From Swiss-Prot:
It comes from Chlorobium chlorochromatii (strain CaD3). The gene is fbp. It catalyses: beta-D-fructose 1,6-bisphosphate + H2O = beta-D-fructose 6-phosphate + phosphate. Pfam families: FBPase (PF00316), FBPase_C (PF18913). The keyword Metal-binding applies. Its main location: cytoplasm. Mg(2+) 1 binds at residues 92, 113, 115. This is Fructose-1,6-bisphosphatase class 1. Pathway: Carbohydrate biosynthesis; Calvin cycle. InterPro entries: FBPase_C_dom (IPR044015), FBPase_class-1 (IPR000146), FBPase_N (IPR033391), FBPtase (IPR028343).
Length: 333
């Protein structure tokens, strides 16, 4: 039998890159993996219990909340917050920051999207959890505040996501490569399946919702015309691959190459995706895998956030593809 490496073992081995660490980050990532198992348990049997459909409320984004959204949010807060390792947390589903109980010894910040792509739950399309970890800036954990959450993405110490699909996959980085794990339900463990993931420099797929084409700016329209025009030298035309679940679309492009685009529109001039919960963690992962992520004008990880639920346009994926998209957005083509 091949040497099976669990995510817990792999995380422990990653400690060698942090000689000053005392195992805290290892415990945090292990907690996240445990929370993912709890969410996975309910996602796979959502159709058998009364957890599908709408909860009859809206979140801070003004979106209708799914029952499974609420469950995932509650499970993550409960499973992770109870240990006191995080001084402060932020969730896409909560308007304000979350101060966990016993946070006096917490030295980290957790920001997360409990269930990305939740509009797909009822039709059995892949959904996922996205998370981001930062060091606490405040010297006293008991005084952790919103300011500790509003850090640039370049300050992340770890980020990752979990996809609940035909198989359950967890991908994470601590700034030393990107690693993927597949959940084995027979033993209840995430096992290493993809070590040191690298994304192709150029792909042949693009992922975006073209339903808002009439509201796209001229740069976006010209870029779409460009990637649909035949040119063998640049592997065009590109093919569309779009699920409507950010984490699933991103994961596919990470492995196969390509670009995910959520541009500004007339209705959403500042974009629609959340900087802190979606763009930053995925940008960190993408760059660690050799890719690129921008808002069309600025590197995502350099953006200085001013709001917990700040939105941003997003161009993320293979470096060459993103750079070309930027040139169109900036009027250079």
């Amino acid at each position: 039998m091949s040497n099976l490496i669990t995510i817990e073992r792999h995380i422990l081995e990653q400690q060698k890159f942090f000689p000053e660490a005392h195992g805290e980050l290892t415990d945090l990532l292990t907690d996240v993996a445990f929370a993912a198992k709890l969410v996975r348990r309910e996602v796979v049997r959502a159709g058998l219990v009364d957890i599908l459909g709408l909860a009859g409320s809206t979140n801070v984004q003004g979106e209708e909340v799914k029952k499974l959204d609420l469950f995932a949010n509650e499970q993550i807060i409960s499973a992770i917050g109870a240990h006191g390792r995080f001084a402060v947390m932020g969730s896409e589903e909560n308007e304000e920051i979350i101060i966990p109980t016993n946070n006096e010894s917490g030295n980290y910040v957790l920001l997360f999207d409990p269930l990305d792509g939740s509009s797909n739950i009822d039709v059995n399309v892949s959904v996922g959890t996205i998370f981001s970890i930062y060091k606490l800036k405040t010297s006293d954990p008991a005084k952790a505040s919103l300011a500790d959450c509003l850090q640039a993405g370049s300050e992340q110490v770890a980020a990752g996501y979990v996809i609940y699909g035909s198989s359950v996959v967890m991908v994470y980085t601590t700034g030393h490569g990107v690693h993927g794990f597949t959940y084995d339900p027979t033993i209840g463990e995430f096992l290493l399946s993809d070590e040191n993931i690298t994304t192709p420099k150029r792909g042949k797929y693009y992922s975006m919702n073209e339903g808002s084409y009439a509201q796209f700016n001229e740069g976006t329209k010209r870029y779409l015309d460009y990637i649909k025009t035949e040119d063998k030298a640049t592997n065009r035309p590109y093919s569309t691959r779009y699920i409507g679940s950010l984490v699933a679309d991103f994961h596919r492009n990470l492995l196969t190459g390509g670009i995910f685009i959520y541009p500004p529109t007339g209705k959403h001039p500042n974009g629609k995706l959340r900087l802190m919960y979606e763009a930053n963690p995925l940008a960190f992962i993408c760059e660690q895998a050799g890719g690129r992520a921008t808002n069309g004008k600025e590197r995502i990880l350099d953006i200085k956030p001013t709001e917990l639920h700040q939105r941003t346009p997003l161009y993320i994926g293979s470096t060459d593809d993103v750079m070309v998209a930027e040139e169109f957005e900036q009027g250079k083509r």
